[in-house]
Amino acid sequence: MRILVFDTETTGLPKERNPSIYKTEQWPHVIQLSYVVYDSELNEVVVLVNDYINIAFNTQISKESQEVHKITREMLNEGITINEALHKFNEYSKHCDLVVGHNVSFDKRMIIVEGVRNKIKIRFW
C-alpha cells in the first residue's frame, strides 16, 4: 500500500467560513507543499518533497500565518510555480491508496482550490 502524508502552508485563512472552492478569491494561496509517499509493502519512502511556491509579489502573507510557519518572501522567491508543484503532486498522489495529514480536510481543499485557480484537475480519491 502506498500512503501519502502531506501538508500545506498558506498565506492565511479563507475570508469566510467554508467558502465554495470555486470562489478562489475567498481562499488564501499555498506557499509550501510538502509530502512523503511511503510504500508499506516495501517499507520504504518513495519520495520526500518540500516545495516552496513562488507567489506573485502583490500576494499578501498574513502576519499571523508568517508567525506560525516562518516562511519569508526570500524563501518563496527561490521556489517553484504552483503549476509545477501541482503537476508533481498529481504524479505522485495518483499512485497512492491512502491520504494522511494533520487537518487534512483543509489541506485537501487548499490543493483543490489551487487546482481550480490554475485550471489543473487534482486527483483526490
What spans do the regions from the language model cover?
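Conserved non-catalytic scaffold segment of RNase H-like nuclease domains
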Residues: 1-117, 123-124
